[in-house]
């Protein structure tokens, strides 16, 4: 195992996101890792809900014959399986496959339930574990067992399905850039790289610091290919001249725990991982310089102001410095450090994970304007409580109500001030870690117009992506591994268009597109 991967594993283990499983390519999700994945689920579920997508759960074990049937109809669809062939001493008449993907299950279900055009669209998503045979495994990047979500939809028309494919692709771009703070390479998959059976596949990828690409999400338009193969039909409102049922048009789209690998590879420093705020298990870490009743009370009051955030007190170790290191290794985006000085001056000290040396001080002392408002509020409150004491409350009861009301208003002042500063720092934090990712990506994309230049850069060990004029011809693409071993077309750019008469650098045919060529996990 090389040093770079050792460092990567160390970051994952020290952050509490990962622990190696007992079998090759498996892993244990410690609390931090699972919470991060659940935060990703929550973000995406909110996006899916906008379209009326509903979550479902399908079986893990799939009859082997389902895949044999699909292989006959879908050229190139032949995933390698984990199979269950025996239960106890009894050999099975038909092997059961541990789910590598769920197309066959969804379409078998659709075949049995869809009847009329009035039931369309079908919009479903599944969060589950899948199993793949991998020779070279890397935590979160290539696993034999991992977590993902896969969405499957059916539509009455091709246009509806194509539009839905595009929408989900855009949602993934938004999620990766804004929630994971990763700069992306997005485009359409080439003929050789698109999903088997798909008419079109769209991808969201990121360029990692080692110069390799990682596919984070895909969205596929299948036309009616899978529905024909699996005999999924519906009765249309407009029957054709023979009155035959119609095949719906389908899509599939998904992302996985690879996202965690991308975060760990991209957002880190010598202290460990740096987690994006949206997905971090703990968004704000509290550290006390010493533990005494005064500081604990001050911490509790400060935490109460921030109940909209995921906060946690880091006090595993006796020394504050060790607790600060612990919070940094776990990648907490923000730290609030409380000591004697903070208590006496009525301030809190804030530190950002991306710039640990910089300290931000927030005062909890009321301004003169706030003090005047509170005095007037208190005077009016006393007068009104006595005037409108319809329930004949005692003096003690009125005093308690009065104190609660004043405390509530004062807490609101303090909360507004603290949250305003924290939101500003969150925005800067997210912007900063995204920009570092974008800067690396932009510096490592190289425009290359001829094969000799490409070959020279590859032989020199230049790491990154090469933007090349490309014909998108399947026969041409299949010879790329012979010319440039370990490289593949990552996607076709939808923003960079090739010049008229520009030629493909591999076969000299006219280029249709610019394509991103690179190595990948």
Language model: regions and residue ranges:
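NTP/phosphate- and nucleic-acid-binding module
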Residues: 1-521
